[in-house]
Amino acid sequence: MSSPPARGARSSLWARVGRHWSLVAGALLALIAAGDDLGGAPAKPTSEFHFVRMFYHDGAYGRSYRGFDRSWTTDYPEAEFHFHLGVSRLTRVDIGEQARMLRVTDDAIFDYPWLYAVEVGRWHLDDTEAARLREYLDRGGFFMVDDFHGTLQWEGFVESMQRVFPDRPIVEISEGDEVFHVLYELNQRIQIPGIAALMSGRTYEQDGVTPHWRGIYDDHGRLMVAINFNMDLGDAWEHADDPRYPEPMTNLAYRFAVNYVVYAMTH
């Protein structure tokens, strides 16, 4: 791994992050005020696949911006933009240019086969939301979770996930599982880190030293929930055009994403 950027480069990056969040927050507030996806009638699908980001409320360890929880917005919108470019170039999937942001309680969620949530160590699902997510998954939906790290955040994730599936275990996805071979042969298991961790000379955050690919399956062996624990694929997509982020890790993050998409669309 290359050495971390100099202090000036770090300061420049964090200044950019601050400016970026101000722009993102303004865009999200405008969407909410306009009732687009988060308030009024959500937009209908225009393609066979859309990137759908799950809106959720933070739990005890969450953050907020002017009253709006914001853990769920991490890496938005650059992650979506680069995800779209990657899937478009690497597959023949008809992917919509416009990503979606939906509450799990929105009926429109059933129009989309693939759902993404980030920083789920901070989320909190009430009983209504948990029941709706269970229904979505039981009816064939696919749920990818990403960018949460360490013991405390794992416990936060499991607390809400057990409301969704109190009767289904979370297990390690085996190397022979179809999801790792449906398009790309994903035999390489390396930790895909966030850029902030890389800048500090590590590939992990908190005490999340070991990466895990875990999942929840239905009664027929279909993977319903893909759990990327102690990893940050969203950062790898977001920084795909940043020379400071290692290209091999970006490439691997894209391959995992493409396999998840193809699996979701065919199972």
Say what each PLM segment does:
Residues S22-A33:
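Bacterial N-terminal signal peptides
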Residues G35-W114, V118-G121, M224, D232-H267:
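Aromatic-Pro/Gly-enriched surface loop or interdomain linker
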Residues F51, I109, W114-W154:
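Short alpha-beta junction capping motif
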Residues G59-G67, Q153-G234, E238-H239, M249, ...:
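An acidic, glycine-rich "communication" segment
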Residues A79, F83, E129-R132, Q153, ...:
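Stable alpha-helical elements in mature extracytoplasmic
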Residues V93-R103, V145-F148, R168-G176:
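Surface-exposed patches in mature extracellular/periplasmic domains of secreted proteins
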